[in-house]
């Protein structure tokens, strides 16, 4: 009986964390589209909740990815703050609706593509030893999302393309594992990524 009670409590907590991740995740994507620095703070909360969910589900690549998100959130806060100061020094107001953009070089694209392929293969082999039920798919999403996050920190508009791909696959991955709240979150992310690209394209200003 005690075992069943613990399992029930664990299920309740897990569902709560999924819903919490969904809510904060939606807030995060709205702030991301508007390019508000607060998104990084919300992202920290979202990542912690997602880490809980993925660890309990045995999706260790996704768990590791959200750990990476915590680190990049700190870097993002610093990087974006510096860019805002740079715009202010140039005499432009950050809150005028302008989205800061940077040019994506062919070298960055090539290195990123190599990182996605190599990273997916290596991580998938590790995940197989950890009995990850979806090792290659989970690994591909993790590596692709890691690159997309770094592109976000660097303010490359092409990061939205990577998010559309990663979030679509993540929706399928979570649904296949019965994580319906998480699947809903990633489906919302995919749609929001399309909206985000359109918004950045319309309001973007290249600063470097």
Specify the residue positions occupied by each region the protein language model found.
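Short, Lys/Arg-enriched N-terminal segments with co-localized hydrophobic residues
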Residues: 1-12
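Polytopic alpha-helical membrane-helix bundles and their juxtamembrane interface segments
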Residues: 12-35, 39-40, 46, 83-91, ...
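Membrane-water interface of transmembrane alpha-helices
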Residues: 68-90
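Early transmembrane hairpin module of multi-pass membrane proteins
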Residues: 18, 23-28, 36, 41-76
């Amino acid at each position: 009986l005690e075992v069943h009670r613990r399992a029930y409590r664990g299920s309740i907590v897990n569902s709560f964390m999924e819903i919490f991740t969904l809510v904060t995740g939606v807030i995060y994507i709205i702030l991301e589209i508007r390019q508000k620095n607060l998104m990084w703070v919300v992202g920290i909360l979202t990542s912690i909740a997602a880490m809980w969910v993925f660890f309990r589900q045995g999706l260790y690549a996704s768990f590791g990815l959200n750990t990476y998100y915590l680190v990049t959130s700190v870097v993002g806060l610093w990087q974006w703050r510096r860019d805002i100061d740079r715009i202010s020094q140039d005499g432009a107001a950050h809150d005028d609706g302008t989205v800061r953009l940077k040019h994506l070089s062919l070298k960055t694209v090539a290195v990123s593509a190599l990182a996605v392929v190599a990273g997916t293969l290596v991580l998938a082999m590790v995940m197989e030893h950890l009995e990850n039920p979806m090792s290659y798919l989970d690994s591909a999403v993790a590596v692709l999302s890691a690159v997309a996050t770094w592109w976000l920190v660097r303010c490359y508009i092409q990061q939205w393309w990577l998010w559309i791909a990663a979030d679509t696959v993540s929706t399928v991955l979570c649904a296949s594992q019965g994580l319906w709240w998480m699947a809903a979150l990633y489906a919302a992310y995919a749609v929001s990524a399309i909206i985000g690209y359109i918004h950045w394209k319309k309001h973007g200003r290249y600063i470097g």
